[in-house]
UniProtKB/Swiss-Prot annotation:
GO terms assigned for molecular function: ATP binding; CoA-ligase activity; long-chain fatty acid-CoA ligase activity
The family this protein is said to belong to: Belongs to the ATP-dependent AMP-binding enzyme family.
Source species taxonomy: Bacteria, Pseudomonadati, Pseudomonadota, Gammaproteobacteria, Pasteurellales
CDD domains: VL_LC_FACS_like (cd05907)
InterPro entries reported for this sequence: AMP-binding_CS, AMP-dep_synth/lig_dom, ANL_N_sf
PROSITE patterns, per database record: AMP_BINDING
Name of this chain's protein: Putative long-chain-fatty-acid--CoA ligase
Keywords in alphabetical order: ATP-binding, Fatty acid metabolism, Ligase, Lipid metabolism, Nucleotide-binding
Catalytic activity: a long-chain fatty acid + ATP + CoA = a long-chain fatty acyl-CoA + AMP + diphosphate
Length: 607
């Protein structure tokens, strides 16, 4: 079986080569920007390369061989990238571990990948690692990436500074040799996908995969060395990791946000031109804007909707290279001054493009952002495809789709309408799992995505649902839970939602409210309560949720509509295994943990 078509390209697009080239030509220009003690600090390309070489030499001093594994267990920070690329410079492999992973999840990855050195980002990750280190026989060293981490008297533990000092000029010849021997067929990473069932699988990606994506993104995107990109999604996920690689490949500035709660302030401070985000980010902004508009005087509401309408017409014409009538130009100038520019300021005022992935984006939300002049590029991809397979074109897209194919991506619709992918971006396979690797591909080498979908005549790709997640009610009706969850879950009062329907008489839902919004609402209605549990039992609160859910699900078929729901006082948790690090629901765990609440929704009076 032929797994994939390898890309024919030379070493010019090898990622490590691209970093070296940028460091040579952009010497004193800014490569990285990060926040320390409340101040943004810059690292020049020259200093960046020096730090990379220092760490590479230290890794060589610890006898790290070609294709050995180095793991990073940390939130985003500039040292994440430094560890990553220093590892790649010596032809070793980076294994990311989500900062939110439990000690047991980290232990599995460390042992399965035979990790030799682990870099930890903060005290919590260090403490978790100490819990399991004695169960990890291949682990030789735990390096604390911050000076604030308090180390125990443990032979494996060391500070960043002491580790760096172990490298010297004695390792320089070997570093030069490793750099000169780099191959596109080398693995650059093994990323463990946190499946909703079963143990994680290590996706093997090589430099040819990454080079393919660098090349196709060059053909598709307008990113220059003048751009500034703010990174706040985790580097342990292929979406932000591949994007960061592309930013460095283009010579743009990569900014780091370790505390995701500070994203709003970082947007106004950094004023980036580029930023990746997931649909939930846009949903929250959209809901907040609409909420503010609904509370505004009638005249302002009219002005807002008029401005959005004008923006929609203006950008539609511009996207299709059509002449913009004189009157519309004047209307747009006024709408932009009064409304649209102020909305763009919520994102810093300079955003020119925002890649979006990880889930489906509601069409109305995508259209809203495009109407105000924010170029959202919703994309589709997975770890196994080194991220992007398809994406929206600039201001020209079908809002219900996941875009058109990236250059050189080959996609067809297979059995059960499954989306099948082939091309240079597709993984080598799953680490130490030959059977699972074989099962992941068709006989002619297409990757099975597990997503059901279809194309329209214009080449737009649509996802209809996850094949394995279709639920069948006891009445024989098929339910697509993610579709219903995305419809209802966009409400400003809902933080998380899990649809229940498999083998049930009707659809029900477990809902975690957005307590910030809910408590503000309760305050407005003068609802008194001692704790959240009491608040969630309040009849006015229950009626409000029922009303809002019914309003949203009118467009759903009758058998798809939620008939009963239960409000939960605690969010679904990564620690408890209810959601994955990428925030996907682990339905089996949720069904078991909330069995009583679910049974109550079906054992009470008929819906």
């Amino acid at each position: 079986m032929k797994i994939k078509n390898r890309v024919n390209m030379n070493l010019d697009l090898h990622f490590v080569h691209r970093i070296q080239q940028q460091a040579k030509t952009r010497t004193n220009m800014t490569a990285l920007r990060y926040k320390e003690h409340g101040l943004w600090r810059d690292i020049s390309w020259k200093n960046f390369q020096e730090q990379l070489n220092q760490l590479s030499r230290a890794l060589l001093a610890h006898n790290i061989d070609v294709q050995d594994k180095i793991a990073i267990f940390a939130h985003n920070m500039e040292r994440w990238t430094i560890v990553d690329i220093a590892t790649l410079q010596i032809r070793a492999i980076t294994v990311p571990i989500y900062a939110t992973n439990t000690a047991q999840q980290a232990e599995f990855i460390l042992n399965h990948a035979d990790v030799k050195i682990l870099f930890v980002g903060d005290q919590e990750q260090y403490d978790q690692t100490l819990e399991i280190a004695h169960h990890c026989p291949k682990l030789q060293k735990i390096v604390a990436m911050k000076s604030t981490i308090q180390l125990q008297q443990d032979p494996l533990s060391c500070t960043w500074e002491s580790f760096i000092k172990t490298g010297s000029n004695a390792q320089q010849d070997e570093l030069t040799q490793r750099l000169n021997q780099k191959q596109l067929s080398d693995l650059f990473t093994i990323i463990y996908t946190s499946g909703t069932t079963g143990e994680p699988k290590g996706v093997m990606l090589d430099y040819a995969n990454l080079a393919h994506q660098l090349e196709t993104h060059d053909l598709s995107l307008n990113v220059t060395d003048q751009d500034i990109s703010l990174s706040f999604l985790p580097f342990s996920h292929i979406f932000e990791r591949a994007w960061a690689a592309y930013i460095l490949h283009r010579g743009a500035i990569l900014c780091y946000l370790e505390d995701t709660n500070q994203v709003r302030s970082a947007l106004t401070e950094i004023r980036p031109t580029l930023m990746c985000a997931v649909p939930r980010f846009y949903e929250k902004i959209y809901a907040a804007v609409l909420d503010k508009v609904q509370k505004a005087p009638k005249l302002r509401q009219i002005m807002f909707h008029w401005a959005i309408s004008v923006g929609q017409k203006y950008f539609d014409l511009r996207a299709n290279n059509k002449a913009i009538p004189f009157l519309l130009k004047k209307q747009f100038a006024l709408a932009d001054k009064l409304v649209l520019s102020k909305l763009r300021q919520l994102l810093g005022g300079r955003i020119k493009m925002m890649p979006c992935g990880g889930a489906k984006l509601e069409p109305a939300i995508g259209l809203f952002f495009h109407a105000i002049g924010i170029n959202i590029k919703l994309g589709y991809g997975m770890t196994e495809t080194t991220a992007t397979v398809s994406c929206w074109h600039d201001f020209q897209f079908n809002p219900n789709s996941i875009g058109t194919l990236m250059p050189k991506a080959e996609v067809k619709i297979g059995e059960n309408n499954e989306i099948l992918v082939r091309g240079g971006m597709v993984m080598k396979g799953y680490y130490k799992k030959p059977e699972e690797t074989a099962q992941a591909f068709t006989e002619d080498g297409f990757l099975k995505t597990g997503d059901a979908g279809e194309f329209d005549e214009q080449g737009n790709l649509f996802i209809t649902d996850r094949i394995k997640e279709l639920m069948k009610t006891s009445n024989g009706k098929y339910i697509a839970p993610q579709y219903i969850e995305s419809k209802i879950g966009k409400d400003k009062f809902i933080e998380q939602i899990a649809i229940i329907a498999d083998a049930k008489k009707y659809v029900s839902a477990l809902i975690v409210p957005c307590f910030d919004s809910l408590e503000e609402y309760a305050k407005q209605l003068n609802i008194k309560y001692h704790d959240r549990l009491e608040l969630l039992k309040n009849s006015d609160i229950l009626k409000m949720f029922e009303h809002r859910i019914n309003a949203v699900q009118k467009e759903l078929a009758h058998f798809e509509q939620v008939k009963k729901f239960t409000l939960l006082s605690q969010a679904f948790s990564i620690k408890l295994g209810e959601i994955t690090p990428t925030l996907k629901l682990r339905r089996k765990v949720i069904l078991e943990r909330y069995r009583k609440q679910i049974e109550a929704m079906y054992h009470s009076q008929e819906a």
